[in-house]
A protein has these predicted regions:
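Conserved beta-strand-loop surface patch within small alpha/beta domains used
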Residues: 1-76, 85-137
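Residue-level "edge-of-site" marker
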Residues: 82
Length: 137
């Protein structure tokens, strides 16, 4: 993801992470993903906007990612995009254009050295931090 974000500078990059959930979900948990998510594929998507402040996933790359994920029995676990010159915090546009309910939104800030990535749960009007950690690479 960081390589893609660097390559696509000065514009935002975007993509999807897919894999499988492992273990049983805690029905009483406040967070939808309080269990192990094993990421098995990363799908870099084409930013149709080609903009440093906006992204829009190009339809063909999104369809190809969806087809591959379905063929491999994977579910989309997260969407990611970069903020080339701002903090890794959702913008108003990120909230308004969020069509991925129930998946973590990772934002990579290229404004830091090294780049800083944060995860968020988004709704149309609000966002809250998502607890996550890499436990195996």
């Amino acid at each position: 993801m960081l390589g893609q974000a660097l390559t696509e500078l000065p514009n935002e990059c975007c993509g999807l992470l897919a894999g499988r959930m492992e273990g049983e979900a805690d029905a009483a948990a406040a967070e939808p993903l309080l269990r192990l998510a094993r990421v098995l594929r990363r799908y870099p998507l084409v930013n149709k906007k080609a903009s440093p402040t906006r992204y829009l996933s190009e339809e063909r790359s999104l369809i190809d990612a969806d087809r591959d994920a379905r063929q491999n029995n994977l579910e989309f676990l997260a969407i990611y995009h970069s903020h080339p010159t701002s903090e890794p915090v959702p913008s108003r546009t990120d909230l308004e254009d969020n069509y991925w309910d129930g998946v973590i939104q990772f934002i990579i800030s290229m404004n830091h050295v090294p780049p800083l990535m944060r995860g968020w749960w988004l709704s149309p009007t609000d966002y809250r931090p998502a607890d996550w950690q890499i436990i195996d690479v």
